[in-house]
């Protein structure tokens, strides 16, 4: 374990004494540090009748148990304090450590011994070995009452709301869109779990088209065959325009009632939301238009879908109506809401957070967009190519639409609406222009970057450098598209498409608690986060604060060599079938230099800290009238590296409240690996100038082009080996073209440029 503490805020002596007193601690500045520590331990061991037994089972140093120490006239020393503090946090002397000073340095222990008041205050804010902060662990065990009222410590709300007394209800928000064309505003189901509280509370909202269930069978049937040739496109200039959605006004009258009439049963939830509920934040789950128990079509990422989610925030602020059921006869107001909202969730859920932020809706104070899409084109396409998300060959937008159109899971809804839905889906297939891979109006209407100037909320991103599903380009573009005055924070980790709120190495959920307590509850604090919090890839459990993602002025340039080299596209039938059957086999052979590729290796002569998108400048020609170029850059050679999927450290040990929704403790393993992908990218040679320009490829005519690979942050040291592989067809991402052509690369006039921080 290694500590990386971002949620803790230094406090004045007056504030520390006051907050400790509110918890029942009577720390006296006139007492000796030893006396104050003894009092502190007696308080936190409240579950024990015989506190002396516990003290006798702990040690003060390698020769003295703690009870004996307190009964002696020995003074409290740095060594004794650290030994005791570590035991309080769940570490075992003689098992986890022998030399306490060396161990504190190894785990980057955040407390510096000196001021016992500050030391004990910070100790309560420090994570235990099993993931909870000490104060959260104590509260979960009943240290203070469940008063169903707010109690703050170090700027964070404590779990003093009973999750068992939470109100669970369902309402149906009247949206301002009519996506199914029936002349009525679409109703959207909202599942609510909120604290039992006499006043008003804020909400964390998860906008998830998956929440009401998915139609996996229909989605699987809509997958595309990737074993097709790359199309030769007609040269043209693509034009798009900014469009607006058509909204619909509320209809009819309804009687006002005070209570919701539909009870919410068990639902799937997000553990960050679970953590926030007993801390006084209502949890809202909204599937949106085209989903089970809601109305409308699944419009998949456009601003009609986002408008319906936005209207839930409008309802929380009194600007839209909600009904108790589908009859629309009884209206229910969100009188319990203080109008302040944060959004949460990963992938499609984080995507909707991005989209919602670009509406500038009043009441949306914070978005926590985890691995979210910023432009849907960049999810299913890249530089004029059809590209599948990593791990999902053959998926395209209509297969996602089929997956999330969960109205068809209700047989009656299927009978009434499936015919119209199929017609809608047929039109969507045409609009995708899968045969060309080109940008068009359909994709432009699902590009949130062009509306980023409207963002008013504070923004938190999380994203993985190894996320080849929602690639790092999405967060990079959104991060840089935000207006300069918007506060933004990026947790850039080394995982894949994963959550980070239950990782041992980073206090992410406590940081979100501090931020939301400040922004949604109005609690006064000095809490702030740096622009970028980056997980160091060169060692286990180490995070660093950075000023920016990209925007580097310095580049390291690597020339590709001399002469010309060829890349053949067509494989033998045997190899083609092997690779088409398992793209992982293709990847393994690609990285080993065994496919049809150009392989270039460099040994670094100095340390290199990459920050931003790598740039490839190529001079090449195709033997035919089309072609694609693929590139991957690897940290190559056996070494210990972070692996992208979190592993389980301890099951169900992180209490999200008070014996409530226990979470697993996870972390990225630091393990021996043969290589690591740093970045990758793909380009249709007919889009070599830009996305809106489709050009002719003249056979055997040299072309000069440059394109950026996926942005990343990655640290390399002197002596490390870089491997660049250039090839055509990628059996995981691109269409699997069988055309017998080759690319010739002019190595002398081609180069790789890596942006880096100054040494």
UniProtKB/Swiss-Prot annotation:
| Gene Ontology molecular-function annotations | aminopeptidase activity; dipeptidyl-peptidase activity; serine-type peptidase activity
Q: What is its EC number?
A: 3.4.14.11
- What is annotated as the active site? 347 (charge relay system), 467 (charge relay system), 497 (charge relay system)
Q: What class of enzyme is it?
A: hydrolase
Q: Which UniProt keywords apply?
A: Aminopeptidase, Hydrolase, Protease, Secreted, Serine protease
Q: What GO CC annotations are associated with the protein?
A: cytoplasm; extracellular region
- Does the keyword Membrane feature in the UniProt annotation? no
SMART domains, per this entry? PepX_C, PepX_N
Q: Note the superkingdom of the native organism.
A: Bacteria
Catalysed reactions, as listed in the record: Hydrolyzes Xaa-Pro-|- bonds to release unblocked, N-terminal dipeptides from substrates including Ala-Pro-|-p-nitroanilide and (sequentially) Tyr-Pro-|-Phe-Pro-|-Gly-Pro-|-Ile
Q: Which GO terms describe its biological process?
A: proteolysis
Where in the cell does this protein reside? Secreted
Answer yes or no on keyword Secreted.
yes
Could you say which protein family the record assigns here?
A: Belongs to the peptidase S15 family.
**Record's PANTHER family?**
COCE_NOND FAMILY, PUTATIVE (AFU_ORTHOLOGUE AFUA_7G00600)-RELATED (PTHR43056:SF10), PEPTIDASE S9 PROLYL OLIGOPEPTIDASE (PTHR43056)
The record's note on quaternary structure and interaction partners says: Homodimer.
Q: What does this protein do?
A: Removes N-terminal dipeptides sequentially from polypeptides having unsubstituted N-termini provided that the penultimate residue is proline.
**Classification via NCBIfam families:** PRK05371.1-4 (NF003783)
Tell me what this protein is called: Xaa-Pro dipeptidyl-peptidase
Annotated organism of origin: Streptococcus gordonii
What is the taxonomic lineage of the source species?
Answer: Bacteria, Bacillati, Bacillota, Bacilli, Lactobacillales
- The gene is pepX
